[in-house]
């Protein structure tokens, strides 16, 4: 099974991917569940990730092509081999983030993004959880308190992009709304509980 987590920066998707991995590992064993992420997932990709995040003035198409090349490396070295071994793969970001950020956010043709993605991978996730959170809240969590209007507009476009992706892929995409209610009275993460319930029904 291939499970992905999506959402804008600061949505809490990384936390949820770790929590679900811990949950599944208790059921299926730690050796049968793989947690990975994009961009990254391999030693080479992690090094390139650091360079990309430090890069100044990289145009959006160049950035997209880097991400696509990194996805090929990640898919062939980590994701596909793990799935072939019948392991569960939990991935923090995948193709939907590319569509939302580079497509809806930066204005690159979404059809081009999908065509490039189809060149480098031959399968899509079985289940995708999109953690939805208010843009102002997400930027606050990301410590971007000094954000400008242009940045705010960008994240609204990205968030709307995720909505569109979910609408077009109801068979695999599930929106999990984060109403800023992190834990219940027993200290259990409420978003995690929502995710587990959806997973149990699939």
From Swiss-Prot:
It holds the Pfam family Thymidylate_kin. Keywords: ATP-binding, Kinase, Nucleotide biosynthesis, Nucleotide-binding, Transferase. The keyword Zinc does not apply. CDD domains: TMPK. The keyword Nuclease does not apply. InterPro entries: P-loop_NTPase, Thymidylate_kin-like_dom, Thymidylate_kin_CS, Thymidylate_kinase. It catalyses: dTMP + ATP = dTDP + ADP. It comes from the Bacteria. One of its GO terms (molecular function) is ATP binding. ATP binds at residues 7-14. One of its GO terms (biological process) is dUDP biosynthetic process. Its EC number is 2.7.4.9. One of its GO terms (cellular component) is cytosol. Belongs to the thymidylate kinase family. Phosphorylation of dTMP to form dTDP in both de novo and salvage pathways of dTTP synthesis. This is Thymidylate kinase.
